[in-house]
């Protein structure tokens, strides 16, 4: 199987044409044509090109963790491109301890029925059947997430077997490429979830960028050796060199709590932002959500980020956690390397 059939631009053009066709049918009022459109999307659902096109539509946006219909409504009002449904926010997962599993399907379904933006949900690393349940439920994307307690300490889900796109976390180039080789359509550069501390996310995107620069400077024979070292197909390494970046959409996640945090991660080269506890563990969730969306979209202009930062109060931010105070066994980022 070829991992990739199209370039980013080609995938984007394909998906936009599909969206334009959908809008034309809707605007025409000729509802008899809608079944034909549904049939068309059904034929292409699950192909490599479509699974990689969905994350492209999220680029430049913010995905927000939610645990209820009310929070999902706030996220949509604030301008989130998608929501991620889970049972507890990462901060609460950390405090509660025990085993963290996927959210109640009834809650996920309620969220899906209450908003118009895409809905994602988390599964435990390696838990094939939690993923199958979410695929049957009809969510838009699955996050095989280190925030939940891993079901398999050694292996991730073989994502090629699913029609639905997956996102996975990574702390370095090797982890990212291994997840892509398993079928991930999107990568999250890992931070330390539930801390409100962006330092680990910063560290890991810098590692990815540094390792990418090293890969680009290698001779071909050295890249062959590197692919063996990273345990990924050589073709995937060559595709990474061709694009001079991870060959899928790469968002930042973990510890992002302010508009400036989001702008920093965009400046460092990510395509968008996941926000976990930073919004709904604050005392000003709607204002903070709007501010982070604004800063993510306008990160190239410091005046816009300043405007976003003025929309919130530091006194209302979530109480952060100094990562240096966490024990090694308390770190979530190390799960699923």
Swiss-Prot record:
Pathway named in the protein's UniProt entry: Cofactor biosynthesis; pyridoxal 5'-phosphate biosynthesis
EC number: 4.3.3.6
GO MF, one example: pyridoxal 5'-phosphate synthase (glutamine hydrolysing) activity
PANTHER family assigned to the protein according to its UniProt record, in alphabetical order: PYRIDOXAL 5'-PHOSPHATE SYNTHASE SUBUNIT SNZ1-RELATED
Family annotation (SUPFAM superfamilies): Ribulose-phoshate binding barrel (SSF51366)
Reactions catalysed, as given in the entry: aldehydo-D-ribose 5-phosphate + D-glyceraldehyde 3-phosphate + L-glutamine = pyridoxal 5'-phosphate + L-glutamate + phosphate + 3 H2O + H(+)
Function: Catalyzes the formation of pyridoxal 5'-phosphate from ribose 5-phosphate (RBP), glyceraldehyde 3-phosphate (G3P) and ammonia. The ammonia is provided by the PdxT subunit. Can also use ribulose 5-phosphate and dihydroxyacetone phosphate as substrates, resulting from enzyme-catalyzed isomerization of RBP and G3P, respectively.
HAMAP family according to UniProt: PdxS
Binding site for D-glyceraldehyde 3-phosphate: 206
Enzyme class (EC, first level): lyase
Stated name of the protein: Pyridoxal 5'-phosphate synthase subunit PdxS
Highest rank taxon of the organism: Archaea
Cross-referenced CDD domains: pdxS
Organism: Metallosphaera sedula (strain ATCC 51363 / DSM 5348 / JCM 9185 / NBRC 15509 / TH2)
Gene Ontology biological-process annotations: amino acid metabolic process; pyridoxal phosphate biosynthetic process; pyridoxine biosynthetic process
Active site location: 122
Similarity-based family: Belongs to the PdxS/SNZ family.
Binding, D-ribose 5-phosphate: 65, 194, 255, 276-277
Keyword field: Lyase, Pyridoxal phosphate, Schiff base
Subunit note: In the presence of PdxT, forms a dodecamer of heterodimers.
Hydrolase recorded as keyword: no
């Amino acid at each position: 199987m070829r991992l990739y059939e199209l370039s980013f631009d080609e995938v984007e053009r394909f998906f936009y044409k599909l969206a334009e066709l959908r809008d034309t049918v809707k605007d025409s009022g000729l509802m008899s044509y809608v079944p034909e459109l549904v049939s068309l999307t059904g034929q292409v659902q699950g192909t490599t090109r479509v699974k990689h096109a969905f994350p492209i539509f999220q680029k430049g946006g913010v995905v927000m963790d939610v645990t209820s219909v009310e929070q999902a409504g706030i996220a949509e009002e604030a301008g989130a491109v998608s929501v991620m449904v889970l049972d507890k926010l990462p901060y609460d997962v950390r405090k509660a301890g025990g085993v963290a599993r996927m959210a109640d399907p009834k809650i996920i379904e309620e969220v899906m029925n209450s908003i118009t933006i895409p809905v994602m949900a988390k599964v435990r690393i390696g838990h094939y059947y939690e993923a199958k349940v979410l695929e049957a439920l009809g969510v838009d994307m699955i996050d095989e997430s280190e925030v939940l307690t891993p079901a398999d300490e050694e292996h991730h889900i073989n994502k090629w077997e699913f029609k639905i796109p997956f996102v996975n976390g990574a702390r370095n180039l090797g982890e990212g490429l291994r997840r892509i080789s398993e079928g991930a359509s999107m990568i999250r550069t890992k931070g330390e979830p539930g801390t409100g501390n962006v330092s680990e996310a910063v560290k890991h995107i810098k590692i990815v960028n540094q390792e990418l620069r090293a890969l680009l400077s290698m001779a071909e024979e050295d890249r062959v050796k590197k692919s063996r070292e990273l345990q990924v197909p050589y073709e995937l390494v060559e595709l990474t060199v061709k694009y001079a970046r991870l060959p899928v959409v790469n968002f930042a996640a973990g510890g992002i709590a302010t508009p400036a945090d989001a702008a920093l991660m965009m400046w460092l080269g990510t395509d968008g932002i996941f926000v976990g506890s930073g919004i709904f563990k604050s005392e000003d969730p709607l204002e903070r959500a709007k501010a982070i969306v604004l800063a993510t979209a306008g990160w190239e202009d410091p005046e816009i980020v300043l405007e976003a930062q003025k929309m919130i109060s530091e006194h209302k931010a979530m109480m952060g956690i100094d990562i240096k105070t966490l024990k090694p066994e308390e770190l979530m980022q190390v799960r699923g390397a």
